[in-house]
A protein has these predicted regions:
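Charged catalytic carboxylate motif
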Residues: 43, 47
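N-terminal nucleotide-binding beta1-loop-alpha1 segment
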Residues: 16-21
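Short acidic/His/Gly/Ser-rich catalytic and metal-binding motifs that mark active-site loops
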Residues: 23-28, 72-74
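Metal-dependent active-site segment of extracytoplasmic phospho-/sulfohydrolases and closely related
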Residues: 61-63
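Active-site-adjacent betaalpha module
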Residues: 1-14, 49-58, 70-73, 81-203
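Acidic/histidine-rich helix-loop elements
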Residues: 25-41
Length: 203
């Protein structure tokens, strides 16, 4: 597949940070055990901090996308959503549902409301926000690489945005899953940039 390197104007670029919350990222979090080994191997959190800091310095738009459990709705579903409801993961107003301190939103940054399923575009006004901001490029990082990150990236791509996943700022349940997405999914969007690659492309 042909790799396309983009030059991204910062004012036309949105960094979407998916579920950098205590339940995923911190000891004691309800899903931390699922990703602990892999995010250590991938250096996910340190890379995400560099990604956020670099994007801020260059003037890119930042959108934080926490998952906030809708217990009634999720408990009526099957599979992953039902499991989250049963485990009370990302419960509203809980420690586990809070965005981690290292990536704490600044006052002028958007914290998306209403993300209660897989893609950040479903049940939210994310698409409206992006169009109103005049965004052309969408960059996605976070959790889980093969689930919410991938689904959100597909949503952005289908809406016509130049889309990239930043794999070294993502977390999966295993190295095998992470490497599968990096190898088989990320190239579909045009390239597989590291944090450093992206920050060079952003101007």
């Amino acid at each position: 597949m042909l790799e396309r390197i983009l030059t991204m104007k910062a004012e036309k670029t949105a960094l979407i940070l998916i579920e950098f919350q205590n339940d995923f990222c911190k000891e004691g979090g309800k899903l931390f055990g699922t990703v602990k080994k892999e995010i250590a191997r991938n250096n996910t959190l340190k890379n995400a901090v560099r990604l956020l800091d670099g994007t801020r310095k260059k003037g890119g738009k930042i959108i934080h996308c926490p998952f906030i459990l809708d217990r009634t709705w999720a408990s009526s579903k099957d599979g992953l959503l039902k499991a989250l409801a049963d485990g009370d993961v990302f419960a509203p107003n809980s420690w586990g549902g809070k965005i981690i301190d290292e990536l704490k939103p600044l006052n002028d940054e958007i914290v998306l409301q209403g993300k209660c399923c897989i893609s950040a575009f479903e049940h939210t006004n994310l698409a409206t926000i992006l169009f109103e901001l005049g965004i052309e490029n969408v960059v996605v990082a976070g959790f889980l690489t093969n689930i919410c990150v991938q689904a959100t990236a597909w949503g952005a791509y289908d809406l016509g945005f130049h889309t990239r996943i930043i794999p070294d700022s993502c977390g999966a349940a295993s190295q095998g899953i992470q490497e599968f997405v990096e190898r088989e999914i990320c190239p579909i969007f045009g390239s597989v940039p590291t944090v450093d690659d992206f920050l060079v492309e952003l101007e």
